[in-house]
Amino acid sequence: MNLQIKHAIFVLGIFLQVQGIKDTSIKIFSSEIKNIDKTPRIETIESTSTVHKVSTMKRIFDLPKLRTKRSALFPAANICPQESLRQILASLQEYYRLRVCQEVVWEAYRIFLDRIPDTEEYQDWVSLCQKETFCLFDIGKNFSNSQEHLDLLQQRIKQRSFPGRKDETASMETLEAPTEAPVVPTDVSRMSLGPFPLPSDDTDLKEILSVTLKDIQKPTTESKTEPIHVSEFSSEEKVEFSISLPNHRFKAELTNSGSPYYQELVGQSQLQLQKIFKKLPGFGEIRVLGFRPKKEEDGSSSTEIQLMAIFKRDHAEAKSPDSHLLSLDSNKIESERIHHGVIEDKQPETYLTATDLKKLIIQLLDGDLSLVEGKIPFGDEVTGTLFRPVTEPDLPKPLADVTEDATLSPELPFVEPRLEAVDREGSELPGMSSKDSSWSPPVSASISRSENLPSFTPSIFSLDAQSPPPLMTTGPTALIPKPTLPTIDYSTIRQLPLESSHWPASSSDRELITSSHDTIRDLDGMDVSDTPALSEISELSGYDSASGQFLEMTTPIPTVRFITTSSETIATKGQELVVFFSLRVANMPFSYDLFNKSSLEYQALEQRFTDLLVPYLRSNLTGFKQLEILSFRNGSVIVNSKVRFAKAVPYNLTQAVRGVLEDLRSTAAQGLNLEIESYSLDIEPADQADPCKLLDCGKFAQCVKNEWTEEAECRCRQGHESHGTLDYQTLNLCPPGKTCVAGREQATPCRPPDHSTNQAQEPGVKKLRQQNKVVKKRNSKLSAIGFEEFEDQDWEGN
């Protein structure tokens, strides 16, 4: 009996084991069939899967271990009890990013390259995706523009376009016979298009013209192709060329793309060539591919710059064969059709044909004197005559009703300056008499706002021959001439005014009216005529119409402007780059002592942030020069700072500073226990920022911008005046860190808030007195220097 029972159990076990193996084989086979159906295009030879024999009883016992219970809240993630909610959310987001990137990269290889990726390249792409180096759709564009994908498409097009034709075999044999690569002609006019078929009207030319230049000479007689819509191939044209610089010797630093000399030369070359190529329609950008040494005919060594000019094409022009067969007949220019890179969609423009574009590029490169001589002037300034005497025909015609008491328009719009030949012979200043040295202004007329005139406030000059120092006086606005200036449109500027301090005056007694007696002594001998109306005076910088005083005895200077691109930032007029930024520290309490720059708490906090920011900015930003903490504001603690850089840096300044501060924010939060809020980062370049935005003057004062120093200062409001010194009593300026105290009908000194009124004010008073002396001395020097330069250049012939 026992023997029969054992025999029955043995037979049952054998039966269950065989049945389990059969079920496993069926499941594996069915899964393989499904995978093959899902990927019909991938043709790979895979080895037969090895089926491991697993006991049915073992699988039954292992089933509970595999099917672990998931969390009801997060069914796809394992939650550890010791993790916080923030850590759990971060883990889920990281896992989600990983899975999405894996799917994106896998599908990109399947769709565009029709193959399974290698482990190393797959991990590289997944890593780039996780770091957000590429957007998800940018990954697809990168794969679609790869050479492997283009070659695969060309192969598929050939296979599907010529099915079962006998002449296809002969054509393929002809193509495979030669061992040398075909020679591509360098001139469009000599390029043979005879063997190339002319398709019918309903055939998309992009399938035929998307092949490379070496495929053009392949003989074929087919005239029909199956339409394959590939719209991104023809949206841009890239032309490679090189420029030889005979007077620039090649340096070893140019072989390293990370060296400062390499980056500086790249930025300067791009800036100069963009000015030349922007004349061509459709020009997008220019790239520097590298530098290489070149030996000249005389045996000397020179530098050759390899560049690439990119032109944008619209959809209509993409269907023109000439746009794909661009080749320039020049010893310095080579054209190549390249299908790489991410293509940006631009608005359609009017483009020239390939032949016209070739001629224009050659004319630009050969016609530019700097390129012919092998020298590229990497500067924004040109030297030349500063002033051009204006003759009567150059003046605008007066209106029908002209009166002598008419006034000039205070402001005129600005136009882009351009260079024009200067003729100094036989011209005089309007109103100048040859018998005496006095200059009476011509009859002024009302001039309406015009788009062809620069934004200069008109000036009236008068000269007194009897005064020992023949100083020239100016009207409301003036500019100081410099040795080198940007190009100026001489056809529209009647006179380039002299930069000096502007002062109100009376036309009757010609006396200088000002509230500062010290300034009168420094500028003795000046007189001003033709007083503008009070409404016009109020529009000038620093004039308070209520008190009738000039708050700032300065003249507005041209606004600082930065040239900013994706790869560099350059300051114009030889100035340095300046960036203002502010950040908020949430976990730091604010104290009113931080309003006073002389307090110990302010100085300690200033030193703390200086020690934190300066090393980080210096090590991460090329060209960093100085950091200045401007002030602290209430709102936890808001730190307002100013950073100075070199005149040019090889990166986008605003984006680079933001990136460094974002990195610093996370570092400070971890190591220094400073919670710097990300959304509070406010970064502005100096050409766009308002200096008064970062200065807190209190409710009894207002911020005033000093046009000479480009700095912001606090000025007491009317009725809340300062008595610290004679100078600041006149200008009503509070020292930085001081606030004005209320006092009606009597002046009260500018002093800190009530809790710190007993602090000594001597350091601040001395500093302010010294600043005033510097400003007055500068005004006097600039007036004398400006007059001497004007007299030497324009009155020499008279």
Swiss-Prot record:
Keyword Cytoplasm in record: no
Chain intervals for the UniProt region annotation (Disordered): 424-446, 745-773
Tissue specificity of this protein: Abundantly expressed in the retina (at protein level).
Signal peptide annotation: 1-20
GO cellular component, one term: photoreceptor outer segment
GO molecular function terms noted in the UniProt entry: chondroitin sulfate binding; heparin binding; hyaluronic acid binding
Stretches assigned to the SEA domain: 235-357, 575-688
Family matches, as SUPFAM superfamilies: SEA domain
Record-level GO BP terms: extracellular matrix organization; visual perception
Chief location category: other
UniProt modification remark: Highly glycosylated (N- and O-linked carbohydrates and sialic acid).
Glycosylation sites: N142, T174, T186, T457, T473, T474, T477, T559, N596, N620, N634, N652
Compartments reported by the entry: Cell projection, Cilium, Photoreceptor outer segment; Secreted, Extracellular space, Extracellular matrix, Interphotoreceptor matrix; Photoreceptor inner segment
Gene3D superfamilies per UniProt: SEA domain
Annotated InterPro entries: IMPG, SEA_dom, SEA_dom_sf
Key words, A-Z: Cell projection, Extracellular matrix, Glycoprotein, Heparin-binding, Hyaluronic acid, Receptor, Repeat, Secreted, Sialic acid, Signal
Biased composition (Low complexity): 430-446
Chain location of the short sequence motif Heparin- and hyaluronan-binding per the record: 625-633
Its biological purpose: Chondroitin sulfate-, heparin- and hyaluronan-binding protein. May serve to form a basic macromolecular scaffold comprising the insoluble interphotoreceptor matrix.
Protein name: Interphotoreceptor matrix proteoglycan 1
Protein's organism: Mus musculus (Mouse)
Gene: Impg1
